[in-house]
Amino acid sequence: MKAERPDGRKLRALKRGHLAEYRAALCLIVKGYRIVAMRYRTKLGEIDIIARRGDLIACVEVKARASFDGAVFAVSDTAQRRIRAASDVWLSRQADFHCLSVRYDIVAVMPWRWPRHLPDAF
């Protein structure tokens, strides 16, 4: 059985998504966060970026859209549940999990603009 190769449209979307994640990570670094993980995957879900500033862990969903509102509303309830489930798995594997506080953020990446960070989005 052969592995499927993504067609051109899917490949462009994948590249655009990865570029958006790197732009979002740069935005967070400038704001004083340390990137702990990118594209953290579990059977329960995926977190685009896990960032840390002190004892705060930010589980960040990155959305590349034409507008800020479009990016924020693109994070469905199902996606939020999956991100929370994946963060529970990640936190359970941290030695200092008991002293960490967790927040769920969105970074909207729009064309020709600096990424916009929405802390405590859900």
Swiss-Prot record:
Pfam families: UPF0102
Gene Ontology terms, MF aspect: nucleic acid binding
Gene3D superfamilies per the UniProt record, alphabetical: 3.40.1350.10
PANTHER family assigned: UPF0102 PROTEIN YRAN
UniProt similarity note: Belongs to the UPF0102 family.
Entry protein name: UPF0102 protein NGR_c36770
Species of the source: Sinorhizobium fredii (strain NBRC 101917 / NGR234)
